[in-house]
Amino acid sequence: MNKKTIVVKFGTSTLTQGSPKLNSPHMMEIVRQIAQLHNDGFRIVIVTSGAIAAGRHYLNHPQLPPTIASKQLLAAVGQSQLIQAWEKLFAIYDIHIGQLLLTRADIEDRERFLNARDTLYALLDNHIIPVINENDAVATAEIKVGDNDNLSALVAILVQAEQLYLLTDQQGLFDSDPRKNPEAKLIPVVEQITDHIRSIAGGSGTNLGTGGMMTKIIAADVATRSGIETIIAPGNRPNVIADLAYEQNIGTKFIAHQSDRLESRKQWLFAAPSAGIITIDNGAQNAILEQNKSLLPAGIINVEGRFSRGEVVKIRTQSGKDIALGMPRYNSDALQLIKGRKSADIENVLGYEYGAVAMHRDDMIILS
């Protein structure tokens, strides 16, 4: 039975529990839950904050000027401490992790997008838990995603997750600021993110982190528009991750309509200019249209145009009908070399391989 893919984002406040350093006992409890879900067959991706806090503690809280360079210094030192903390705890359960440091450019550039996604899929397929952070040590304002809430939403889209959990020091989204209004009520379900929902989100909750409730609302909006259910929940609640995975009602759930997942991809692919044409044989046509299969090199008859890996191309039948748009795993030169060949021959012909398929079904939209 295939279990769902879940992206879990941990804010600095969740990992430090209000202290100036990573809280090892609390992280141990987090890892226990994720290990349980991992062993139960769930595909878990971690997006972690905490590098700057870890770096500051490791350097014994140095007096640094409030500059970007100072933050990048702390991130550079702290990232190794952060990943070591995760690694040591998961090793207790004999679970391997893999670190990815991303910037906005890795998400927005199509070829780098595919490379990042392929890496994530390879980790998950080999039962390795990806641990992701923004590459704060080198990212400039122009290439920063901005905060790990937004990064987690983009990662959820990248791996086509079913759910995104944003764990924080709050119980969820309230109808007013609970720190100022003791009568504030938790909003258990948000059907649609409206201006009213945005208006009740406050600022950053702690001085250790960079995100507040507003960044979580923005992230939820990005994720739910792509068909990914998003939940803001308290990171300090016992067993919160496992309970959410097994569908207990905790925190605030943002409903995603599954039609949005396909529609958002359709809009993106339809808007992109076609860079080339791949003509396929009747067997490949049947596999794509009738069996919802990926396109294999063996089914390719001809390749027209010059295009890079990840650019949008048309898939055309022998009769000249365009049946799909999609992003190929290989560029046009590579496809010319492997067309008509078995997938097992790809590495021998090219000297490398990005997988057995020329175009994955997840990167393909069928034209009506």
UniProtKB/Swiss-Prot annotation:
Residue sites binding ATP per the record: K9, T168, D169, T210, G211, G212, M213, M214, T215, K216
Alphabetized UniProt keyword annotations: Amino-acid biosynthesis, ATP-binding, Cytoplasm, Kinase, Nucleotide-binding, Proline biosynthesis, Transferase
Stored Pfam families: AA_kinase, PUA
Cellular component terms (Gene Ontology): cytosol
GO biological process terms, semicolon-separated: L-proline biosynthetic process; proline biosynthetic process
Residue intervals of the PUA domain: 275-353
UniProt protein name: Glutamate 5-kinase
Species annotation: Haemophilus influenzae (strain ATCC 51907 / DSM 11121 / KW20 / Rd)
Phylogenetic placement of the source organism: Bacteria, Pseudomonadati, Pseudomonadota, Gammaproteobacteria, Pasteurellales
The gene coding this protein: proB
